[in-house]
């Protein structure tokens, strides 16, 4: 089987925006407009934040109401991203994945574009495993509260740890 990509992210945003305006994709009036709250992605770890800013401008033009980012572990990087995107009147929710192991942390850092773990975090998770990863998530969430509109936690099937993090904060 082959994947079929008939619509890219900008096209999908535009479709939702069009439906919210009360039109279908052929331009016909809908009985009622939809009321989608349209989200888009952002990447604080992008190598060029100016290009990322231009992408976000296009996403907002095409209907995005809010942004959810890649997971962040470098708060200075997150602050630079928030500052660079401050011209836009959309809430930015920073992503957070609680680290379960050193293997997971290393994989995210080395293999997933836009996810950058500091050496301090890698060292802590190497020594303390999942417990250290949970502590880092709590500390990171405390800082996110100060700089962003919110956070979206990606629990990766570990609801108990996520609840522990939320209850701590």
Show where each model-derived region lies:
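C-terminal helical cap(s) of enzyme catalytic domains, especially alpha/beta-barrels
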Residues: 1, 5, 12-13, 78-82, ...
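Conserved, mostly hydrophobic/aromatic
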Residues: 59, 63, 94, 151
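A short secondary-structure junction signal
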Residues: 49-55, 71, 79-81
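Flavin-dependent oxidoreductase catalytic cores
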Residues: 36, 124-127, 168
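Non-catalytic positions within long, well-ordered alpha-helices that form the structural scaffold/packing
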Residues: 60, 144-145
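Active-site glycine-rich loop that binds ribose-phosphate moieties when present
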Residues: 24-27, 47-62
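Active-site pocket-lining/capping segments in soluble small-molecule metabolic enzymes
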Residues: 3-31, 41-46, 87-140, 157
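Catalytic beta/alpha-barrel core
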Residues: 65-74, 150-155
């Amino acid at each position: 089987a082959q994947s079929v990509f008939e619509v890219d992210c900008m096209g999908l945003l535009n479709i939702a925006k069009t439906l919210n305006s009360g039109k279908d994709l052929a331009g016909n009036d809908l009985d009622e407009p939809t009321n989608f709250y349209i989200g888009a992605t952002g990447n604080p770890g992008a190598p060029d934040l100016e290009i990322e800013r231009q992408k976000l401008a296009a996403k907002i033009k095409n209907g995005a109401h809010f942004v959810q980012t890649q997971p962040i572990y470098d708060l200075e990087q997150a602050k630079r991203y928030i500052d660079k995107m401050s011209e836009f009147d959309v809430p930015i929710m920073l992503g957070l994945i609680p680290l379960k192991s050193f293997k997971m942390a290393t994989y995210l850092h080395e293999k997933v574009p836009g996810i950058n773990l500091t050496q301090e975090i890698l060292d802590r998770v190497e020594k303390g495993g999942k417990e250290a990863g949970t502590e880092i998530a709590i500390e990171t969430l405390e800082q996110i509260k100060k700089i962003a509109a919110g956070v979206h936690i990606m629990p990766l099937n570990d609801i108990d740890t996520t609840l522990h993090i939320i209850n701590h904060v």
